[in-house]
Curated annotation (Swiss-Prot):
Record lineage: Viruses, Riboviria, Pararnavirae, Artverviricota, Revtraviricetes
EC number of this enzyme: 3.4.23.16, 2.7.7.49, 2.7.7.7, 3.1.26.13
Name of the encoding gene: gag-pol
Keywords: Activation of host caspases by virus, AIDS, Aspartyl protease, Capsid protein, DNA integration, DNA recombination, DNA-binding, DNA-directed DNA polymerase, Endonuclease, Eukaryotic host gene expression shutoff by virus, Eukaryotic host translation shutoff by virus, Host cell membrane, Host cytoplasm, Host endosome, Host gene expression shutoff by virus, Host membrane, Host nucleus, Host-virus interaction, Hydrolase, Lipid-binding, Lipoprotein, Magnesium, Membrane, Metal-binding, Modulation of host cell apoptosis by virus, Multifunctional enzyme, Myristate, Nuclease, Nucleotidyltransferase, Phosphoprotein, Protease, Repeat, RNA-binding, RNA-directed DNA polymerase, Transferase, Viral genome integration, Viral nucleoprotein, Viral penetration into host nucleus, Viral release from host cell, Virion, Virion maturation, Virus entry into host cell, Zinc, Zinc-finger
Residues that hold Mg(2+) 1 according to the record: D701, D776, D777
Domain RNase H type-1: 1025-1148
Ranges annotated as DNA-binding: 1374-1421
Cofactor needs: Mg(2+)
Polar residues composition-biased segments: 447-480
Example GO biological process: symbiont-mediated suppression of host gene expression
Protein name listed in UniProt: Gag-Pol polyprotein
Catalysed reaction, written as an equation: Specific for a P1 residue that is hydrophobic, and P1' variable, but often Pro; Endohydrolysis of RNA in RNA/DNA hybrids. Three different cleavage modes: 1. sequence-specific internal cleavage of RNA. Human immunodeficiency virus type 1 and Moloney murine leukemia virus enzymes prefer to cleave the RNA strand one nucleotide away from the RNA-DNA junction. 2. RNA 5'-end directed cleavage 13-19 nucleotides from the RNA end. 3. DNA 3'-end directed cleavage 15-20 nucleotides away from the primer terminus; 3'-end directed exonucleolytic cleavage of viral RNA-DNA hybrid; DNA(n) + a 2'-deoxyribonucleoside 5'-triphosphate = DNA(n+1) + diphosphate
Lipid-linked residues (N-myristoyl glycine): G2
Regions crossing the membrane: none
Annotated segments matching region Interaction with membrane phosphatidylinositol 4,5-bisphosphate and RNA: 14-33
């Protein structure tokens, strides 16, 4: 105790002991109070030494003050003691504790005011557009969301109807909002009830997930602490506004507003997908669809996609070709990657028809004939053959000069221990039992997967074979099934595919080295002279068509085995032995299905699999499909199924590129509609500017990607398809997929998510290797030397192969430049692939579109590219083939772009150790260019911006939009924002920013003097100019005649009115301002009542698409000072009223709205919503909306939306709510929103049962839905339900059919009670008034009825429906015998559907017919027991 007595000494201790504990009390502070405070501080984990100084006391006060409201008496006493001690330290004279607290409060207020004054100068730097702000006392208070924001939100939903633009608009409008604000926004949406219900379901699901992940902590909440928010708290249903503010501003904060907004955005995404159901991935060209129609559909869907322009450009470049039908795709790929849209459309005209095929054949014949003539002149000497290395496979050097690491073993036979020159075999022994380059035993598949994927004995044997991917050769003496059983398993000779299967073949007496390629249909050899006749042919090759000579019945000897078939001779990069020869040798290639864990897939809720009949197919297509499916079955990709699978999807076949082979296609459109939605795991493509510089680079491509990933076993049954037989000779053969099918919407996202799982085991032990993966394209980089780099590349390929993924050699790029994702990569730089701008005398719309696309693609590395003038040529609805005349500006722009593209430009790679800088230049004509760089003159990437955004704008506003685009792009590519260098002076920026700080966000930036600089051309005054003439301006126009007037009246007696034609109200308002500026001096005050005109001019535009606005801008620039103000119209303001009468004369229609006063009276009494007033008093909606907007009691929250949950007519929800310490029992009719409510004396079962019986006596109640409260689970309520025949159900948390309706009605009822509480003395009276207002004075929801009208309508409709059903059931007891036309024989019996005066409607089997009464006999159906010999139709005739 003595130790802490040293806190105060001498004079301070005397002053301490003179202070009274309470005003007017006798007790004074003593030394023991200091000792007590010392001990209490230790309880609260605060340092007692802080009591020694005034600064320490101030810190303690700051720490304790927030907990005072919820703290104990001891905490309050401790705070009072420390506050008094602070005054003693500061030598502030006080008499008692209350004075000390008052002094502390005064000091805090002064400090707060100083802080706010100091921050006033910097107010422009931080956005204040948040609903939660700090008041003068330092407390966080809530500013309700403004009506202007709500109006903007409602307008967006009404105009856009949940198109993709709704989500960013919602995000912007709800910045910083609390859950209560967000609910207000959602409640203002009047229509779109289905969408709102979807949103509500999503919120409920997310809230339940939140509760699962954040369980409630056991035990009570500690003093001074907030409880943790539950899911329903975040959604604003069970939390108060004060709790929401406390969570959002606490330490640490819980951003409940942001969390709730994220849930809403998830729901909005689902709604947007529902309203825009067609994805760009679903746009595919039909087999016979013209290419032009397909392109029209493609670009129409592309506009609705939620993607950046770069991604849309990529979609155009890749998906347009990828989703074309095979005939068009063959031609499009032959055109190359840089083909324009016009070239594509021209090339694809009439594709597939006989005329097209004749043209192709004629061209091929002429080419071959020319070649033949040339060969005769040169005595058949072929081109000199380039030398080729045996070791690495490259041309240009021999194996002894090869620098690549030497292959192990003999290059001919594959055995180790000798080299090729010492090899005795001189021929590749690929058919021996011992494997070349044996790699050891690879992983084996689990037996379950083998059974699922390989139904036949033969395929099971292959799936369990030692190698992951192998070529099997069936010997001439294959085992019988019995023999196989005796020996245990078949043991065919195998060739591993760890290296390329190159063999030596003998053809036409010549030895050649060739590649065994099971992926090739045909056998293709490089230039070789073969005997016999040949015919010309074109086949699809790498990069386009290859012209070849076709020789038939050619004998090829492969390792002692002979095969006879067709051989094609032409300029192939490698000799290929295709399937036409390999099948004769009995070879098959086994692709195992990857052992990746399958992704579970389901159908959409409430949907079943597709049951689409197979359409007829020609005999040749059936044969082709049968062969393809047998091969796929052997490889385990599909399995046979029986009749127990009820699902089916149509299958068909189309010719491949060379038009000799067939390709199987499955029409998965119906399955795609029924399959669950997937989230695209990868939302964009990687950009080379974001790549870090690497010493060594390799680019790989994954082959047979989809067919290597297994499909969820539970979902496989839905992929069933049938191969029919000709003339239904035999039952169709049924299959289902075991792997991801081509054309199914789940294949891309599942493959995207599977690849990272496969690459992760390789990435972890190889951190020095960087892998960029987009779908099946792989970029692999490292800082290793090229020799060291290639070793892990081979490891990666082997790793992928073990998982069932191949990396074909033909797409394995080892040397620069690397072609990747449309770019060209070099070791230290990158660029876009070469771009050639076409030279044309006449340009079509299609030409300009392709030209702009090329320039946009080039602009990411070529600085200064402009397309604005070219884009202007495309305005308006024009056909693709329309001729466009280039304007002088467009020709100049095109010429400038040609000059820019003449010199190749490269970008460098990103260095994380250096700063990222973005510099912007203004190009004029609303066009901007920018560069990202880390070192001067070494650009990472460039770009352009040419979006105006609004009709009236200025350069500063555009500059902010450019900065935001750049910041977003930078975050996507590099994960951070750059330092900006902007062509605008700080003074200019500050002048605009002072008034428009809320318009946008600007990061850190510095001024760069790059002309032309951005500047403001004029500024408006903030206050009226004294001694200057004031112009009151106004305009009016008639909607029907389009005749209007504009003019002004001045405070000095001047006036001017001009008549206008073909105008609108908005134009006349602007015309009036222009007249005032024109007729005034260098300084002027202008007063308008047009918010539209005021908004345009206050934004200080310096350019506009409107001629009138441009004239106003010119006048403003010429003035020295201008003050512009707004006053509300029709409020009796002097000058405004005078000019209004002048311009309205003969223009505006005068409306005598007698109901306005009555509507205002009604609203003051009942606070009716605007729909009810508009309906009852027959006044335009704008008037009641204004009445509601002006009522302070109706601005608490948006209107409640009724009838969102569609339930049966007999369901009611009951709940108890509390107000003013009393209990209100509320019952809500779910289907209509009708309310019954009463104040009950106690929350007991007896009172609840009595209320329930009263309710059942007034309305038909079949089911009641309650929570699990003790009064609802009581025996009294159960007895009342039993007696009245009511079924009782209890609520389930977060179930939309649970207590959601009554919970929302509780809030609505309390809101109405708050509006009318002053009119009633007792709460029970106010409750009944509120029930009356809700049921009969509020309209909205289903049908636009009030709740009272709606419940009556629903019950009446229910009675009518039941009555109608009874009549239908009665009428179905009759049967009809009838005669048809002149046929004398009676037919029947048929079902009676309807009986009229002159005719009856009957159903005979599946046909519905109308029969005249005179030709029909109606009898009652008495069943089989009455069907005796005497039961004749005529005797039972009811007519």
């Amino acid at each position: 105790m003595g130790a802490r007595a040293s806190i105060l000494r001498g004079e301070k201790l005397d002053a301490w002991e003179k202070i009274k504990l309470r005003p007017g009390g006798k007790k004074h502070y003593m030394l023991k109070h200091l000792v007590w405070a010392n001990r209490e501080l230790e309880k609260f984990a605060l340092n007692p030494d802080l009591l020694d100084t005034s600064a320490g006391c101030k810190q303690i006060i700051k720490q304790l003050q927030p907990a005072l409201q919820t703290g104990t008496e001891e905490l309050k006493s401790l705070f009072n003691t420390v506050a008094t001690l602070y005054c003693v330290h500061q030598k502030i004279e006080i008499k008692d504790t209350k004075e000390a607290l008052d002094k502390i409060e005064e000091e805090q207020n002064e400090s707060q005011q100083k802080t706010q004054q100091a921050g006033a100068a910097d107010r422009g730097k931080d956005s204040q557009n948040y609903p939660i702000v700090q008041n003068m006392q330092g407390q966080m208070v809530h500013q309700p969301i403004s009506a202007r924001t709500l109006n903007a939100w409602v307008k967006v939903v009404e105009e856009k109807a949940f198109s993709p633009e709704v989500i960013p608009m919602f995000t912007a409008l709800s910045e910083g909002a609390t859950p209560q604000d967000l609910n207000t926004m959602l409640n203002t949406v009047g229509g779109h009830q289905a969408a709102m219900q979807m949103l509500k379901d999503t919120i409920n699901e997310e809230a339940a997930e939140w509760d699962r992940l954040h369980p409630v902590h056991a035990g009570p909440v500690a003093p001074g602490q907030m409880r943790d928010p539950r899911g329903s708290d975040i959604a604003g249903t069970t939390s108060t506004l004060q709790e929401q503010i406390a969570w959002m501003t606490g330490n640490p904060p819980v951003p409940v507003g942001d969390i709730y907004k994220r849930w809403i955005i998830l729901g909005l995404n689902k709604i947007v997908r529902m309203y825009s159901p067609v994805s760009i991935l679903d746009i595919k060209q039909g087999p016979k669809e013209p290419f032009r129609d397909y392109v029209d559909r493609f670009f129409k869907t592309l506009r609705a996609e939620q993607a950046t322009q770069d991604v849309k450009n990529w979609m155009t470049d890749t998906l347009l070709v990828q989703n074309a039908n095979p005939d068009c795709k063959t031609i499009l790929r032959a055109l190359g990657p840089g083909a324009s849209l016009e070239e594509m459309m021209t090339a694809c005209q009439g594709v597939g028809g006989p005329a097209h095929k004749a043209r192709v054949l004629a061209e091929a014949m002429s080419q071959v004939n020319n070649t033949t003539i040339m060969m005769q002149k040169s005595n058949f000497k072929g081109p000199k053959r380039a030398i080729k290395c045996f070791n690495c496979g490259k041309e240009g050097h021999l194996a002894r000069n090869c620098r690549a690491p030497r292959k192990k073993g003999c290059w001919k036979c594959g055995k180790e221990g000798h080299q090729m020159k010492d090899c005795t075999e001189r021929q590749a022994n690929f058919f021996r039992e011992t494997l070349a380059f044996q790699q050891g035993k690879a992983r084996e598949f689990p037996s379950e997967q083998t059974r699922a994927n390989s139904p036949t004995r033969e395929s099971q044997t292959r799936a369990n074979s030692p190698t992951t991917r192998e070529l099997q050769v069936r010997g001439s003496n294959t085992f019988s099934e019995a023999g196989a059983e005796r020996q245990g398993s078949l043991n065919f000779p195998q060739i591993t595919l760890w290296q390329r299967p190159l063999v030596t073949i003998k053809i036409g007496g010549q030895l050649k080295e060739a590649l065994l390629d099971t992926g090739a249909d045909d056998t293709v050899l490089e230039e070789i002279n073969l005997p016999g006749k040949w015919k010309p042919k074109m086949i699809g090759g790498i990069g386009g068509f290859i012209k070849v000579r076709q020789y038939d019945q050619i004998i090829i000897e492969i390792c002692g085995k002979k095969a006879i078939g067709t051989v094609l001779v032409g300029p192939t990069p490698v000799n290929i032995i295709g399937r036409n020869m390999l099948t004769q040798l009995g070879r098959t290639l086994n692709f195992p299905i990857s052992p990746i864990e399958t992704v579970p897939v389901k159908l959409k809720p409430g949907m079943d699999g597709p049951k689409v009949k197979q359409w007829p197919l020609t005999e040749e297509k059936i044969k082709a499909l049968t062969a393809i499916c047998e091969e796929m079955e052997q490889e385990g990709k599909i399995s046979r199924i029986g009749p127990e699978n009820p699902y089916n999807t149509p299958v068909f076949a189309i010719k491949k590129k060379d038009s000799t082979k067939w390709r199987k296609l499955v029409d998965f459109r119906e399955l795609n509609k029924r399959t669950q939605d997937f989230w695209e795991v990868q939302l964009g493509i990687p950009h080379p500017a974001g790549l870090k510089k690497k010493k060594s680079v390799t680019v790989l491509d994954v082959g047979d990607a989809y067919f290597s990933v297994p499909l969820d076993e539970g979902f496989r049954k839905y992929t069933a398809f049938t191969i029919p037989s000709t003339n239904n000779e035999t039952p169709g053969i049924r299959y289902q997929y075991n792997v991801l099918p081509q054309g199914w919407k789940g294949s891309p996202p599942i493959f995207q998510s599977s690849m990272p799982q496969i690459l992760e085991p390789f990435r972890a032990p190889n951190p020095e290797i960087v892998i960029y993966q987009y779908m099946d394209d792989l970029y692999v980089g490292s800082d290793l030397e090229i020799g060291q780099h290639r070793a892990p590349i081979e490891e990666l390929r082997e790793h992928l192969l073990k998982w069932g993924f191949t990396t074909p050699d033909k797409k394995h790029q080892k040397e620069p430049p690397f072609l990747w994702m449309g770019y060209e990569l070099h070791p230290d730089k990158w660029t876009v692939q070469p771009i050639q701008l076409p030279e044309k005398d006449s340009w079509t719309v299609n030409d300009i579109q392709k030209l702009v696309g090329k320039l946009n693609w080039a602009s990411q590395i070529y600085p200064g590219i402009k397309v604005r003038q070219l884009c202007k040529l495309l305005r308006g609805a024009k056909a693709l083939t329309d001729i466009v005349t280039l304007t002088e500006e467009a020709e100049l722009e095109l010429a400038e772009n040609r000059e820019i593209l003449k010199e190749p430009v490269h970008g460098v790679f990103y260095d994380p150790s250096k700063d990222l800088i973005a510099e912007i230049q203004k190009q004029g004509n609303d066009q901007w260019t920018f560069q990202f760089y880390q070192e001067p003159f070494k650009n990472l990437k460039t770009g352009k911006f040419a979006k105006r955004g609004t009709a009236h704008t200025n350069d500063v506003k555009q500059l902010t939009a450019v900065v935001q685009k750049i910041a977003l792009e930078s975050i996507v590519i590099w994960g951070k924002t750059p330092k900006f260098r902007l062509p605008i002076q700080k003074e200019t920026w500050e002048a605009w920013w002072t008034d428009y700080w809320q318009a946008t966000w600007i990061p850190e930036w510095e001024f760069v003097n790059t002309p032309p600089l951005v500047k403001l051309w004029y500024q408006l005054e903030k206050e009226p100019i004294a001694g200057v003439e004031t112009f009151y301006v106004d305009g009016a126009a008639n909607r029907e005649t389009k005749i209007g007037k504009a003019g002004y009246v001045t405070d000095r007696g001047r006036q001017k009115i001009v008549s206008l034609t073909e105008t609108t109200n908005q134009k006349t308002e602007l015309q009036a301002i222009q007249l005032a500026l024109q007729d005034s001096g260098s300084e002027v005050n202008i007063v308008t009542d047009s918010q539209y005109a005021l908004g345009i001019i206050l934004a200080q535009p310096d350019k506009s698409e409107s001629e009138i606005v441009n004239q106003i801008i010119e006048q403003l620039i010429s003035k020295e000072r201008v003050y512009l103000s707004w006053v509300p119209a029709h409020k009796g303001i002097g000058g405004n009223e005078q000019v209004d009468k002048l311009v309205s004369s003969g223009i505006r229609k005068v409306l005598f709205l007698d109901g306005i006063d009555k509507a205002q009276e009604e609203h003051e009494k009942y606070h009716s919503n605007w729909r009810a007033m508009a309906n009852e008093f027959n006044i335009p909606p704008v008037v009641p909306k204004e009445i509601v907007a002006c009522c302070d009691k109706c601005q608490l929250k948006g209107e409640a939306i009724h009838g969102q949950v569609n339930c049966s007519p007999g369901i009611w929800q009951l709940d108890c709510t509390h107000l003013e310490g009393k209990i209100i029992l509320v019952a809500v009719h779910v289907a209509s929103g009708y309310i019954e409510a009463e104040v009950i004396p106690a929350e007991t079962g007896q009172e609840t049962a009595y209320f329930l019986l009263k309710l059942a006596g007034r309305w038909p109640v079949r089911v009641i839905h309650t929570d699990n409260g003790s009064n609802f689970t009581s025996n009294a309520v159960k007895a009342a339900c039993w007696w009245a025949g009511i079924q009782q159900e209890f609520g389930i948390p977060y179930n939309p059919q649970s207590q959601g309706v009554v919970e929302s009605m509780n809030k609505e009822l309390k809101k109405i009670i708050g509006q009318v509480r002053e009119q009633a003395e007792h709460l029970k009276t106010a409750v009944q008034m509120a029930v009356f207002i809700h049921n009969f004075k509020r309209r909205g929801g289903i049908g636009g009825y009030s709740a009272g009208e709606r419940i009556i309508d629903i019950i009446a409709s229910d009675i009518q429906t039941k009555e109608l059903q009874n009549q239908i059931l009665k009428i179905q007891n009759f049967r009809v015998y009838y005669r048809d036309s002149r046929d004398p024989i009676w037919k029947g019996p048929a079902k009676l559907l309807w009986k009229g005066e002159g005719a009856v409607v009957i159903q005979d089997n599946s046909d519905i017919k109308v029969v005249p009464r005179r030709k029909a006999k109606i009898i009652r159906d008495y069943g089989k027991q009455m069907a005796g010999a005497d039961c004749v139709a005529g005797r039972q005739d009811e007519d």
